[in-house]
């Protein structure tokens, strides 16, 4: 009895057309993974987002994380900060270092930084004089960008699935806070001070990232009043501008209301 043995030969995909189809398939697959990660962040499912990110990084798919981070910043998503924080405290510090802009790492690590208002290119500081409550008015300094007067660091606080920041001035050991009263320059804008305590939501802030002319910037909002930190239009004899809380929409104007966060 004779048996006919048939061998199946599988040829590798070597033609340009076949290779192109394979690349398109991989690109489509990565796009789906990007959308899944983006949506997890957008819906506040940060634990899932961290798990996905750690998995993609272990598989050599860091480009997925990079693209998602870029899109979050371009789209001005506040959730970018929560995602970054959860990575930072959840074994994902290397991911933050590799795929987030430097200023995110400076914020999360509590490094000394300068907070510079983009519109006037002035660094935030606290004034040298105090009121009866030992509070100091916050200004944008007309000259200084190098001394301890303009040195700050951020202290993180996680609450109700959100990350907030206490903004600590290292020169005077005081915390940035928003006043309950408005300034005389505008009846709607609130005065911003440095104070000794940080036990209320007036001393807590949240950030919204943005991109403008290839720069990564931040809108800085007070938690209690939801007002954005800005510098006023009035200039004093030293070239300083008073810091106030802007009562109005700012997200559409990063060229005017946003801040650089840079190493000190």
Swiss-Prot record:
Record has Signal as a keyword: yes
Signal peptide: 1-23
Cell compartment(s), UniProt: Secreted
Family from the record: Belongs to the 30 kDa lipoprotein family.
InterPro entries: Lipoprotein_11, Lipoprotein_11_N
Annotated protein name in UniProt: Low molecular mass lipoprotein PBMHPC-23
Keyword terms: Lipoprotein, Secreted, Signal
Major subcellular location class: secreted
Source domain of life: Eukaryota
Other comment: This lipoprotein belongs to the group of structurally related '30 kDa proteins' that comprise major protein components of the fifth (and last) instar larvae and of pupae.
Keyword Signal annotated: yes
Gene Ontology cellular-component annotations: extracellular region
